[in-house]
Regions:
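PRY/SPRY (B30.2) beta-sandwich protein-interaction domains
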Residues: 1-198
Length: 198
């Protein structure tokens, strides 16, 4: 019973990932997702969101615009392994040792350790993430200034991540995975030719 009007040609050539509202890391780690699944408001709760693309090869870049950072030591952005979830309610990717993050207090978190890394960041800052899965390295930027290579030897499939590990602190952000460099109108579009930008 199919006719021509029941069919739709799909030729995906310019796809962008978003935050995945159903791929929260564990129970009680959900916030409120809006703006085409690019904005996350954590509602003063623990959050851990992965993006919809798993990355195992190639070079990738995305940016996170910081809206609210309640407690710098617990607000993080970076990557974590795909196909891993918390073993209990509230168990996040940092607890599981499956994340590489640049923390708002300037520290880094990598599987098995933490330490000093770069400048602190706050509300109004943009954190860029440059991931080279061919070389297995990740480098972060604060407002276009490199913070240096943070880690190497990354051989797992990973996905972009934002997480906040203090139930009493707010962490709200908007992502740009290439589709909207205005961060839902929070900034002036950078004119990169993304859909809805110019």
């Amino acid at each position: 019973n199919l006719v021509a009007t029941d069919q739709m040609i799909d030729t995906p050539t310019n796809n962008f990932c978003t935050w995945n509202p159903i791929d929260i890391f564990a129970a009680n780690l959900a916030g409120v997702v809006s703006e085409g699944n690019l904005k996350i408001v954590d509602s003063i709760n623990h959050i851990a969101y992965r993006a919809t693309f798993g990355l195992s090869s190639g070079k990738w870049y995305w940016e996170i615009y910081m809206i609210t950072i309640g407690q710098a030591a617990n607000c993080r952005t970076g990557i974590c392994k795909t196909n891993t979830w918390g073993t209990s309610s509230g168990t996040g990717p940092i607890d599981m040792g499956v994340a590489w993050t640049y923390d708002a207090d300037g520290q880094k978190t990598i599987p098995g350790s933490t330490g000093a890394y770069g400048a602190t960041y706050a509300a109004g800052d943009i954190v860029g993430v440059a991931l080279d899965m061919d070389a297995g390295t990740i480098t972060f930027y604060k407002n276009n200034a490199t913070q240096g290579e943070m880690a190497s030897g990354i051989t797992y499939e990973v996905a972009p991540l934002v997480c906040e590990g203090n139930g009493g602190a707010q962490f709200d952000s908007i992502a740009n995975f290439g589709q909207d460099s205005s961060f839902a109108g929070a900034k002036t579009a950078q004119g990169n030719g993304g859909d809805g930008e110019d």
